[in-house]
A protein has these predicted regions:
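Short acidic, glycine/proline-enriched helix-loop-strand junctions
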Residues: 87, 100-105, 146-181
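Conserved strand-to-loop "acid loop" that flanks and positions the catalytic carboxylate
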Residues: 17
Length: 181
């Protein structure tokens, strides 16, 4: 399939539940690169060492990193011990690599109405910016493809998200994107 796409595509983004969890990711990235494509990775950052290894091996040219909440609220959002430390360490890995000419990256936060993600969004963006990231996206959660166990709409929610986006954009990013639902 990819061989037929040469000249039509610039790259392939490896994603899934968590791309970096896959033991064969580095080998898959090498194959994609050998076919002449760039490689991107979507991650929530639970494997900072594996991310560093991929970067140092030259196997990734772009990363989309989800930072879900402030460190003190991460467990509430993802329900896993050490998730905050690992995600924020992955951000450090990306910032350090970018300082050495490493891959481009985007940090994004997805917000859900009535959830700590919405309460934290502007402060998360401030801390991400202070850490050295320069490309950021605020995303409204969407119901498509979910179990329906949480509400992604609420009265006034769109307006709240637009105001969050304005405050976050004002932090001075090289590129800021707001992705409404």
């Amino acid at each position: 399939l990819l061989r037929r796409r040469r000249g039509l595509l610039d790259g392939v983004v490896l994603t899934g539940g968590e791309a970096l969890r896959q033991d064969a990711l580095a080998d898959a990235a090498r194959e994609v690169i050998d076919m002449g494509f760039q490689v991107g990775v979507h991650t929530a950052g639970p494997y900072p060492r594996r991310l560093r290894d991929m970067i140092e091996a030259g196997l990734v040219s772009w990363v989309g990193l989800d930072i879900k909440a402030l460190p003190e609220h991460y467990g509430q959002v993802v329900g896993r011990a050490n998730a905050a430390a690992r995600a924020w360490e992955s951000l450090e890995v990306l910032v350090e690599a970018a300082g050495r000419g490493g891959p481009d990256f985007e940090v994004r936060t997805t917000v859900v109405p009535g959830d700590v993600t919405a309460d934290d969004a502007v402060e998360v963006a401030r801390r991400v910016h202070a850490a050295g990231a320069r490309v950021y996206a605020l995303q409204q959660a969407r119901s498509e493809g979910t179990s329906g166990e949480f509400d992604v709409v609420a009265p006034g929610w769109d307006g709240m998200c637009e105001r969050m986006a304005e405050r976050i954009e004002a932090l001075g990013w090289d590129r800021f994107t707001y992705r409404p639902a």
